Structure formats: structure tokens, C-alpha cells
Amino acid sequence: PLKETKKKEEAVEEKEEPVVEGRKSKRKKKKKEEPKEETPEPVEPEDPRAKSKGTELVLYNLKTGESKSITGVMEYSLTEKGNHLFFEYDKVDSLNESGIHAINTANGEMTTLNEGMIEYKKMSTDEEGNQIAFFATANTKDDDHKYFSLMHWSAGKASATIVADTTTAGVPENWMVSDNSNIRFSESGKRVYFGTAPRPFEYAYEADTTLLKDDRPDVDVWSYNDPYIQPMQKLQAGREKNRSFDVMLDTQTGKLVQLAGPDLESVTIDTRNDRDFVLAMNDQPYRTQMTWDTQIPRDFYKISTSTGDAELLIKGAKGFPSLSPAGNYLTWHNIEDGHWYMMNVASGNIKNLTEGMSVSFANELHDSPSLAGSYGTPGWSDDDAAFFLYDRYDIWRVDPKGGSAVNVTNGFGRQNKITMRYQRLDREARTISTEGRATLSAFNEWTKASGFVTANMNGSSDPQIVVMEDMSIGGLIKAKNADRVLVRKSTYQEYSEVYAANSVSMTGLKKLSNVGAQEEPYNWGTAELIEFDNTYDGETMQAILYKPENFDPNKKYPMIAYF
């Protein structure tokens, strides 16, 4: 009986189950497989680049057609003038060590600036391309904290040297170089700006491994006297953790000067000038007011670039003062009274520039529950000789040494409801030339026509219209070394195409692009400027009526009103 039972069980195992449609059979008849001889899979040779976390960088000579390939590159920087290529190697093999290297593009010579550090960050070069600064650290990810150094190299030196770390004179006690900051050279190359920050601080309980999670403090304490409310503190916690404070390095003497700190967090650095001071702003005494007023006052200081000492210039300013190009004056728009003010930095004297003038320099159409901002300023003329201001329509010239303000556009804008704004054709220019005629954009507030006019910035006369059409004309760009310009023209029905002209006189205007052709197969629409009287006060208003291209005036259409 035992043998018969065993035979029946074997028969059941070998019997296949019926196949149900849509369901796979769970059991299949086993087939005896012949043993196969295993063949080893081919082993591909190891690519040495696989060891690197970097990528391949190709330096191509456009004149000769020659190229140089560099593998394992983590970061690179080609100088503005193209005379040096700086890059960071990640270790690929025994021949290529990790580090910062430089290639002289004129002769192809490569120089190793530094190697052996664990991490390099944020390479920055000067304008001439003969200097580089970067952050480096020997700390690994296993260390509790990373302490970075600032390293600097200039052409002619054998290697880069550490110019700032925790031990350098000028770095505050218990502070360190912050890799969260950016590195910037001044235009002259004589200064490097970067950031420092307090070293990480740990409470005793944080390092105590015997404490359970429930035994560790985890509370948020807030007081009504705190500068920011608790939700804002939480929102800014990450930024505050990574905050750094500006410091200046003199590349010739190696001297460090701390410019910013916890009491003066915001410093305005103009890398185009090597002045003996920088402008700093402090809003800490007024931050509690942000709970009910976003337009809070601010105190402004000048910080000596020799000593780091701060001198108060303006207390409780309701505006944002900015320095003139030569650094002689501070100008700002006071949002409380709507006037422009000027301070002589040397004497500290302040005067109202727009008091008694017949027009407003604050936004006349401002309609929100806040103080109106200004129409802005196009800037200064050479040597801080004149300061220019915008009103709603025209441009004004103000003499910082005294005298009456002059309406450069002679009131033409207000008389014709045309808003005019200065066009900076030389993108590298820092001041406004008062010689010859300047190009201004023009926009008719009522007809919506736009174009360009020219004006004498040193006098007072009606502008001369260059081009004015019932379409949007803008985006004026002038060639650097030729009297050629590009503009863009468009309407609701015509795409913003690019046009070229022989000069700012817009002669020989030629269409260069034809992107609008892609719209031809589609039913587009029309736009019509209409006028109506406001039933509330009788004022004449304007609106745009959009209709489909195949609009039938005999049909009724649904209408959406947006106001």
C-alpha cells in the first residue's frame, strides 16, 4: 500500500493542470535539462576615467584647430581674455593628481597651482586673467566640521599660497573662512572680496552620545521683542546658518580687513572702484516694524577699507541711498515725502534736490496701501558733474553743487503724454555723456505708440523723433565697434521680430527674423484700443478689446471683463 500511494502522488505531480484563459498555469511538466558548459563572460578593460567623478574638458584653439582633452575635471574657469584656463582635477591615475591647475593658452604650458587638498571650491579670476583665488580644505566628510582656506595665485608664482584661514590676522577670533560666500576680484585686481563667519558652535548635550532623543532639548523660544516673528525665523533659519560676512584682502600687501559683521550685515561692494570706504546698511533697530509695515527705515554707514571702522552717515532713511560713480555723493528717494535727497559724503551736508519743483518724482499712479516709489534715475554724468532724474514723462538734470534743475527734454514728454527713458547704448559705460545727443525710448501713454527720440543731455530742448509707430518698439542694442543697431517690433498680431538698422537714426531698417510665420495656420485675434467714461467720476478711461480673427459682428459672443 505504501508503494501504491507513492506512485499515485508522483502521477499527480506529473499531471498538468488545465489552462484557464487569462491565467498562467502554475505547474508545468518538468523537463530534464542537459547540463550546459558555462563560458566565461568577456571582461572589458577598465577605463581609468571611471575612477574619476569629473568629466572630460576639451580646450579648442579656434585659430589652429588644435584641441587638448583633459579628463577628470571637476570645475573650470576660462578667463575673460582667454589667456588662462584654470581647472580642478579629480584623481584619475597616478599621473593626474587631484588639485588646481592652470594652462597658458598662448603656449599650452600647464602649471600645478595646488594639489593634495580634499576639496576645492569656487574658483574666481581677475579681469586680466593673471590671478585666481579659490577655497580649499584638507578636512574629509568624516570630520565634524570643514575649515576652508582662501588660496591665491598670480602669474609668475610657482604655486598658490594660503592667504586667509583661521589663524590669519584680520580674521575675527573664533571665526573662519566661509565657503558659503562668493569670491570677487576688484576690477584693478588689487582686492579680493570674500566672506568669513563664526565657527560652528555645539552645546554640550549635542556631543553627548549617552542622551536619548527624548532627553535632548527640542523647543523654539520666541519673545515679542524678537526682530522677526517665529514663522519668519524658521523660514530664514537655513539662510542664517549659512550667512557670511564680507571681508577684503589686499592682494599686494596680504592685509585682511573685516567689513561686515553681525551688527552690520549688509555691505555694498563696488568692484569697479578701489575706494577707501564701502557703504553698509543696518535695519536691525527697525525690524520689529516689519510686522505691520514692510517699508521700514534703515541706517547707513561708511566702512573704512583700511581699518574696518564704521561711521554713521544717515539714520532712519526711508529709501535706498546709492553712491555716485566717483564716490562723492549719496542720493536717495525719500518715500515719505516723495523728494530726492543728496548727501555730500565728505562734508555730511544733505539737501533736497526736488523741493519746490512743479512736478512729482513719486509714482503719480501709485494705488496700493503703501508709500509710492520713485520713477528712478538713469545715473550720473562724468566726474559726478550732474545727476539725472526721471519724472512720469521727462528727464531732469541736477547740479550737485547748486543751481536750478533743468528739464533736459523741455517738458515735451508731459505736454504730449510721452514717457522718455535714457538708452545706454554702450553697455560698459558707467556714466552718461553730455556731449552730442543721447537716444531715449519713447512711449505715448494715450495712443500706445512707441519708438525712439534723441535729446541733448546738456541743454534743454525738444527731443527729435527718430521713429514712432503704433506698435511696440524696443530692445535697442548697439554693436560695440560699429554704427549698427538691433531693435524688436511687435503688435498683438505681429510677433516680436528682430530688425537691423544702419545707426540709431534707424535708417535702412531690415527685418532679420520671421518667427511669426509659425502663427499663420492658427486663428489668432485682433486687439482694439477703446475709450469709455468712468461712471464714478466721469474720467475718460481706456481698455483693450480682444476679438477672434474670424469675428462676426452679427453673432453674440460671451465676454470676459478683466480690470
Set out the residue ranges of the language-model regions.
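Beta-propeller folds
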Residues: 1-484, 490-496, 500-501
